[in-house]
Amino acid sequence: MSLKQIVGHKLLNDVIRPLKKGDGRSAWNVLIVDTLAMRMLSSCCKMHNIMEEGITIVEDLNKRREPLPTLEAIYLIAPTAESIDKLIQDYCARNLYKCAHVFFTEACSDQLFSTLSKSAAARFIKTLKEINIAFTPYESQVFNLDSPDTFFLYYNAQKQGGLTSNLERIAEQIATVCATLGEYPSLRYRADFERNVELGHLVEQKLDAYKADDPSMGEGADKARSQLIIIDRGYDAITPLLHELTLQAMCYDLLGIENDVYKYETGGSDENLEKEVLLDENDDLWVEMRHKHIAVVSQEVTKNLKKFSESKGNKGTMDSKSIKDLSMLIKRMPQHKKELNKFSTHISLAEECMKQYQQGVDKLCKVEQDLSTGIDAEGERVRDAMKLMVPLLIDPAVRCEDRLRLILLYILSKNGITDENLNKLLQHANISMADKETITNAAYLGLNIVTDTGRKKTWTPTKKERPHEQVYQSSRWVPVIKDIIEDAIDERLDTKHFPFLAGRQVNQGYRAPASARYGQWHKERGQQSNYRSGPRLIIYIIGGVTFSEMRACYEVTAARKPWEVVIGSDRIITPDKFLTNLRDLNKPRDI
C-alpha cells in the first residue's frame, strides 16, 4: 500500500468505520476537523466514501457551527491548546452534539490531557485515542507537514524564539510518518549544517516513544535496513532555482497552479468555458505523464487519445485541429466525456508549457544548465559564464524573478562572489537594492554568497555518470538528492557528512519498555498487515521539497526494488516560492 492508501485506510478503519451504527436517522455522525486534518482527509478520502460510513457533514473546528444535539461528533484534531479549548467550548453552555469521539492526530501532552480530563466536556467524551497521522500524504511517496514557518525559524538565527516549539512539533510529525509506515528506521542527518543534529535527536526521542507503545514497529523483512535522513535546504540550492522541463515541475513553475488546481479555457469556437481541474493521483493520465519530459508529453497524450478513440469505435482520422479542440469528439462520444476531458486537460497543459518554453524559457534553460553543471551541451567546460548570462540579464522581456534565479545560479557556480561584483550584476540586470536581499539572504542556508575573504568548501556527493538514462540537452542537471538516495541504498553515502545518530545505525531486536502513560493507545494489534515488506528510505528536507526531488524518489524506487523512497518537507516549493522565502527570511514575521 502507498502512503496515501495507508492513511486513507487508517482514517476509515480506525476513526470513522468503528463508530458507524447501522441504518436509520440515528446512524449519522458529524465529523469535526482542523486545518491539517481537513487536508489529510481531502488527500486520501472521497466525500462519498465518508458518507457511506455514516458521516452526514464535515465541519471546520475553527468556524462557527450550528448545534446538532441529537448527533454524535467525531473530532479529528491536533492536540493543541487552541483545539482542545474549542472542543471544551462545544460542551460548555449548551452541548453542540450528543457526545464526542476524540481522535488526536498525534501524541497529546500531559498538560493538555489533564486540562481536557478536568473540563466539563470530559463526561461527554466517549472515545479518546491518538492515531499518529500528523501530516498530509501529498502523493503516494510524498508527505507534507504544512509548516510554512519552519523555513524562517530554522534558517534565521534572530528568530529562534519560536524555534524550539516548532522543532518539537515537526519532530513529532516526522515520527508519525514513520509510525504510519510501520518503520523504526536508522537515523542520519547532514552534518554540514549544525542544527540538523538537534532535530535528529528530537525525532529519535519521538520515535523511541512510539516504539515503546508498539514494539512491533519496524519489524519485518529487511526493515532493519530502513533509514530516515534529515537534510537542510542548503544541501542543494540549485534544484529549486532551475526551470525544470518535466511536466509536473514545469506546470507548477510556469502556469500559476495554486492548491493543485489547474484552470484553463475549453470549448468550441462559439463558446469558451473556464474549467478547473485538480491535478492529483486520481487522474491516471497525470500519474503516467507527470515525470516525463515535455518533449514527449504532447506526442504521448495525442497517441493515447487516438488509441482510446479508436478502441471505442471512432475510426475517423484525427487531425491536429481536432486534437487541439476536443469538443467535436466529445459530441460524437458523449458517453466517454469524462475520459475525453482528461485528454483535453493534458493537451492544454502540454500546449501551455510549450508556448512558455518557446517564448523565452528555452534560452533560460540553456544558460541555467550550463551554469549548474559547469559543462555546455557539447560536453565542454564553461569558461565564460558571464558572457552567457548578460544577454538575458539585460533583456527587459525576462522576468525579474528569472534574472534573480540566474544570478543566484551564477553565484553558486562560483561558490560565492565579491560584493562589488554582485552590485555590478544587479546593475546590469536592473534589479533594485531591495531585491538584493533575496540573494544575500541565501547565506543563511550556509551557502557562500558574498565572499570578500576566504570561502568554505561545500561537500556534495560525486556526480554519477548515467549512461542508461535518457538525457535532454536542456535537462542535464540531476538533483543532488538522487545521488544521496542511491548512495544510501548502496551503503556508500559518506558517513562523515551524513553520520548516523549514535546507537541508531542498526536496529537489531530493539525492545522498548511499555508506555506507562498511554498503554496501547497508539495502535491496535494486527495492524502491521497493511505494511509492505522491504526497506524504506525516508527523506525529510527542512525548508521545502521541489517537484524535481519528488520525481527523483519515484525514479530510484522504480530502479531499485525492493526499496521504496518516501520524501517530504514542511512544504512543497516552486522556484518562485523559494525566492519569496529567501526574500522574507530577514523580515519581521509574526509566528
UniProtKB/Swiss-Prot annotation:
<dbReference type="GO" id="GO:0030141">
    <property type="term" value="C:secretory granule"/>
</dbReference>
<dbReference type="Pfam" id="PF00995">
    <property type="entry name" value="Sec1"/>
</dbReference>
<keyword id="KW-0966">Cell projection</keyword>
<dbReference type="GO" id="GO:0098793">
    <property type="term" value="C:presynapse"/>
</dbReference>
<feature type="modified residue" description="Phosphoserine; by PKC">
    <location>
        <position position="322"/>
    </location>
</feature>
<dbReference type="GO" id="GO:0007271">
    <property type="term" value="P:synaptic transmission, cholinergic"/>
</dbReference>
<feature type="modified residue" description="Phosphoserine">
    <location>
        <position position="2"/>
    </location>
</feature>
<dbReference type="InterPro" id="IPR001619">
    <property type="entry name" value="Sec1-like"/>
</dbReference>
<keyword id="KW-0813">Transport</keyword>
<keyword id="KW-0597">Phosphoprotein</keyword>
<keyword id="KW-0963">Cytoplasm</keyword>
<dbReference type="GO" id="GO:0016081">
    <property type="term" value="P:synaptic vesicle docking"/>
</dbReference>
<dbReference type="GO" id="GO:0006904">
    <property type="term" value="P:vesicle docking involved in exocytosis"/>
</dbReference>
<dbReference type="GO" id="GO:0005829">
    <property type="term" value="C:cytosol"/>
</dbReference>
<keyword id="KW-0472">Membrane</keyword>
<keyword id="KW-0653">Protein transport</keyword>
<dbReference type="GO" id="GO:0099525">
    <property type="term" value="P:presynaptic dense core vesicle exocytosis"/>
</dbReference>
<dbReference type="GO" id="GO:0005886">
    <property type="term" value="C:plasma membrane"/>
</dbReference>
<dbReference type="InterPro" id="IPR043127">
    <property type="entry name" value="Sec-1-like_dom3a"/>
</dbReference>
<protein>
    <recommendedName>
        <fullName>Acetylcholine regulator unc-18</fullName>
    </recommendedName>
</protein>
<dbReference type="GO" id="GO:0030424">
    <property type="term" value="C:axon"/>
</dbReference>
<comment type="function">
    <text>Mediates vesicle exocytosis, protein trafficking and neurotransmission. Associates with SNARE protein unc-64 and thereby promotes the anterograde transport of unc-64 out of the endoplasmic reticulum and out of neuronal cell bodies. Plays a role in synaptic vesicle docking and tethering through its association with unc-64. Competes with SNARE protein tom-1 for binding to unc-64. Through association with unc-64, mediates the release of the neurotransmitter acetylcholine from cholinergic motor neurons, and thereby promotes locomotory behaviors.</text>
</comment>
<dbReference type="InterPro" id="IPR036045">
    <property type="entry name" value="Sec1-like_sf"/>
</dbReference>
<feature type="modified residue" description="Phosphoserine">
    <location>
        <position position="515"/>
    </location>
</feature>
<dbReference type="GO" id="GO:0019905">
    <property type="term" value="F:syntaxin binding"/>
</dbReference>
<dbReference type="InterPro" id="IPR027482">
    <property type="entry name" value="Sec1-like_dom2"/>
</dbReference>
<dbReference type="GO" id="GO:0006886">
    <property type="term" value="P:intracellular protein transport"/>
</dbReference>
<comment type="similarity">
    <text>Belongs to the STXBP/unc-18/SEC1 family.</text>
</comment>
<feature type="modified residue" description="Phosphothreonine">
    <location>
        <position position="462"/>
    </location>
</feature>
<dbReference type="GO" id="GO:0001956">
    <property type="term" value="P:positive regulation of neurotransmitter secretion"/>
</dbReference>
<comment type="subunit">
    <text>Monomer. Interacts with unc-64 (via N-terminus, in open or in closed conformation); the interaction is direct. Competes with tom-1 for binding to unc-64. Interaction with unc-64 via the N-terminus mediates the secretion of the neurotransmitter acetylcholine from cholinergic motor neurons. Interaction with unc-64 in open conformation promotes synaptic vesicle docking and tethering. When phosphorylated by pkc-2, interaction in closed conformation with unc-64 is reduced. Interaction with unc-64 is reduced in the presence of unc-13.</text>
</comment>
<keyword id="KW-1003">Cell membrane</keyword>
<dbReference type="InterPro" id="IPR043154">
    <property type="entry name" value="Sec-1-like_dom1"/>
</dbReference>
